[in-house]
Amino acid sequence: MAPRTPLALFVSLNLLFFTYTSATTGTCPKNSIEIGTCVTVLNLVDLTLGNPPVKPCCSLIQGLADLEAAVCLCTAVKASILGIVNINLPINLSVLLNVCSRNAPKSFQCA
């Protein structure tokens, strides 16, 4: 019978490394109230061109890569979660991403 020490060490190391890789991913918020905080960013940028309070909106997409953040916000805007009647998708999406110091990939289109 083979010793169990190498097998136990192998399983332990696999569990350890798997835990590290799966704990670092962000997710797109599914709560419409959370994503609705981004509306204030759009309204304040349109009205006051100053320094809008962006922390609530940017913190929602903080753990996401740029492409994931763009897809998340695009899906929210398209689903009318944000409650905006007349929206210009490319401009509003780029405003939200720029305010959060993010960039959509050049080939990305929110259609």
Swiss-Prot record:
Belongs to the plant LTP family. PEARLI1 subfamily. InterPro entries: Bifun_inhib/LTP/seed_sf, Bifunc_inhib/LTP/seed_store, Hydrophob_seed_dom, Plant_LTP/defense-related. One of its GO terms (cellular component) is extracellular region. Residues 1-23 form the signal peptide. The lineage of its organism: Eukaryota, Viridiplantae, Streptophyta, Embryophyta, Tracheophyta. It is found in: Secreted. SUPFAM superfamilies: Bifunctional inhibitor/lipid-transfer protein/seed storage 2S albumin (SSF47699). The keyword Disulfide bond applies. Induction: Induced between 4 and 8 hours after treatment with auxin and remains high for at least 24 hours. This is Putative lipid-binding protein AIR1. CDD domains: HPS_like. Its main location: secreted. It comes from Arabidopsis thaliana. GO terms for biological process: lateral root morphogenesis; response to auxin. Gene3D superfamilies: Plant lipid-transfer and hydrophobic proteins. It comes from the Eukaryota. Disulfide bonds join C28-C58, C38-C57, C74-C110. Keywords: Disulfide bond, Secreted, Signal.
